[in-house]
């Protein structure tokens, strides 16, 4: 009985995710879902990456997912782009964004005039991986401070993602991290994963990331 | 109807948590539940703290919670202490430890001869806060690399904890973190929170932590 309930939730979610994909296909918008542990640098990445896409003439929107507060959305306000905040607290403090929350958020965006919409998911390396948001691209951000074993310990996240960003590489000189082993562990879980090391603060790797996203643009 | 189901799960969990508290009260064991995002340094903390408690004559046990792998338990094996691994993957890749998993783990430990049992919960700053494990003390570990806004964005975790450890303080010189603001944000969510900054790698703050735990010992 319990399994049936979970299945129904996932089936309902997948149906809404398909509806989202239909909508973004119609408007030729690339929907990119950023997932990670809390504090891996998703918001800082958006602060730096979005102006680089704007400089190439693209129009950007953001869906901010947080349990509570609008702190991340406020950090992005200087970019002068449409931002929709989803707070999951009224829905029981949900630990992830489901398609049922992303779909109404899309209603608030003028998709026909947006080339890229970034979803910043709730900071959590576990649950967001279980729910399809309808995104075209799933991206996991893992900070170098989190340790090289994380892909093996949280495999589903790395299995559902197309791209892994190894963030905060500016801190590498002060850490014991074996970057090659981290890459190997990521590829052991998902051999198709594209991997970019980045430092949003220094700008390292962001041009590669920008060009990779532009190539996927319909 | 859905709310009813969630309530039943939480009620069943709370009943088992009470049973756990009865057992550890009988054996005079202090059960300590460590929670945090992935990669905040829970395992490294246990590697350093446990020998310091052993040096004071205390007997220690550990319950390791992971979705999959026994990597953390293996890191603790040199300590030569009883360790019980709980992998939540067979239970649907659960993102937290519930009392229903901790209770059978206690069966594998000789509680009468253990002064402290540490639970290393699944790395997740959201869901573990929602489920009482039956622990006497809830501890959140937040790494300085995660940013000062996290208590405001993940308030439930800081609300249910007695102690907050600000970890990896050895990295502070390379970060933009305002440590006073982080403390203020923690106390804004939970004014009763005890806070220790620590560096497990350098040993900073660990003697304070050890003495704080010993004072709570029955």
Question: At which residue positions do the language-model features occur?
Answer:
Chain A
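Nucleotide-state-sensitive switch-loop elements of NTP-binding domains
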Residues: 3-22, 26-32, 40, 49-135, ...
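The Walker A (P-loop) glycine that initiates the GxxxxGKT/S ATP-binding motif of P-loop NTPases
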Residues: 36
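Walker A/P-loop
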Residues: 43
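Residues at the starts of beta-strands that form the adenosine-phosphate
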Residues: 59-60, 137, 162, 194
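Active-site glycine-centered loops adjacent to acidic/histidine catalytic or metal-binding residues
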Residues: 66, 167, 199
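Phosphate/Mg2+-binding loops and adjacent switch elements
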Residues: 119-182
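Canonical P-loop GTPase G-domain recognition
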Residues: 171-218
């Amino acid at each position: 009985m319990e399994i049936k309930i979970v299945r129904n939730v996932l089936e309902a979610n997948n149906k809404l995710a398909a509806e989202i994909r239909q909508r973004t296909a119609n408007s030729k918008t690339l929907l990119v879902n950023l997932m990670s542990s809390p504090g891996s640098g998703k918001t800082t990445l958006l602060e730096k990456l979005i102006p680089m896409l704007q400089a190439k003439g693209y129009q950007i929107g953001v869906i901010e997912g947080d349990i509570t507060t609008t702190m991340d959305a406020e950090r992005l306000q200087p970019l002068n782009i449409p931002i929709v905040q989803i707070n999951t607290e009224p829905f029981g403090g949900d630990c992830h964004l489901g398609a049922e929350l992303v779909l109404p958020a899309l209603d608030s965006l003028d998709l026909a005039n947006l080339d890229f919409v970034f979803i910043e998911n709730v900071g959590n390396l576990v649950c967001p991986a279980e729910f399809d948001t309808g995104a075209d691209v799933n991206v996991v951000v893992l900070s170098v401070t989190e340790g090289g074993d994380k892909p093996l310990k949280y495999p589903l996240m790395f299995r559902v993602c197309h791209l892994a960003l190894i963030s905060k590489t500016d801190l590498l000189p002060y850490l014991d991290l074996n970057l090659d082993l981290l890459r190997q562990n990521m590829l052991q879980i998902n051999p198709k994963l594209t991997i970019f090391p980045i430092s949003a603060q220094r700008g390292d790797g962001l041009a590669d990331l920008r060009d990779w996203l532009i190539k996927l643009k319909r």
